[in-house]
Amino acid sequence: MKLDLFKWEKPAWIVSSLLVLISIFAMAISWAQFQAPFRPGLDFVGGTRLQLQLECASSNNCPAAIDVAEVQDILGGVGLGNSSVQVIEDYTLSIRQQTLDVEQREAVQKALNEGIGKFDPETIQIDTVGPTVGKALFRSGVLALVISLLGIIIYLTIRFQLDYAVFAIIALLYDALITMGAFAIFGLVGGVEVDSLFLVALLTIIGFSVNDTVVIYDRVRETLERHSDWDINHVVDDAVNQTLTRSINTSLTTSLPLVAIFLFGGDSLKFFALALIIGFASGVYSSIFMATTLWAWWRKWRSPKNPPREMVAEV
């Protein structure tokens, strides 16, 4: 497999820029609606979530899917019109409210049974998270992301040089932004909420993406050692093509079980797997088209009249 990297450099950057703009736009709309870049789940905002499933779902003979507007009207009738409502796989209902005591919960279940149909009491799930715990969990997740990025910068600076580290971080931030933008869109269009597993997914994506980038950078360094008289673009193109098959195969084999989890897993695991699929695909793309071309541009700009030389750091 042969890729003419710099032939596709401009189209790749145009696509990347469009995806970044779409992601930022989606997160801006989410911020206006939810005061967060995506629809926050119970883990982050706190409150109580009540999940119920229609009794007919077990025998697969329900006459119609649950209608969100109808549920909102019923909840409004019991004084809970400001609840967040989500329908899962047509026949399962998830209701989130900041406060939902026992009396309110019983009133909701009674109203829903009368207005929509009989819900199976054995499938009822109730989760409660305090607002303080939710905020602390969010802060801990963000702190973990920041620490991981700082650790990557230090590691890559020691193993290679600072400019390698900077452009690798730019590629990682791109992967995180694209994944967050996708879930901002899912939240706006499909009501998908983000929970603590999403932060775990972002950390996993960062680790996967930096691994791809390190492999390519390692080939860049080796090629510079052997061919210090080569043009920088030639060096980068050669390094990318040496690792291209490996990057694609690794991504595909990693994504196959994630696709299975997405198709057959529970709701939380389903969107966790989807985040990883998006992030891993973005990681392969950014390590090939972003981290490398940025580094090549910087090296040519820094010494345009000099033949490329590399001060190789010993690992």
From Swiss-Prot:
Keywords, ordered alphabetically: Cell inner membrane, Cell membrane, Membrane, Protein transport, Translocation, Transmembrane, Transmembrane helix, Transport
One protein family per Pfam: Sec_GG
One GO location term (cellular component): plasma membrane
GO biological-process terms attached to the record: intracellular protein transmembrane transport; protein targeting; protein transport; protein transport by the Sec complex
Keyword Transmembrane helix: yes
Gene3D superfamilies the record matches: Multidrug efflux transporter AcrB transmembrane domain (1.20.1640.10)
TM region(s), chain numbering: 12-32, 136-156, 166-186, 188-208, 247-267, 271-291
Subcellular location: Cell inner membrane
InterPro entries recorded: SecD/SecF_arch_bac, SecD/SecF_bac, SecD/SecF_CS, SecD_SecF_C, SecD_SecF_C_bact, SecF_bac
Main location, first listed in the record: membrane
Keyword Protein transport part of the UniProt annotation: yes
Source organism, top-level taxon: Bacteria
Family: Belongs to the SecD/SecF family. SecF subfamily.
Subunit note: Forms a complex with SecD. Part of the essential Sec protein translocation apparatus which comprises SecA, SecYEG and auxiliary proteins SecDF. Other proteins may also be involved.
Designated name of the protein: Protein translocase subunit SecF
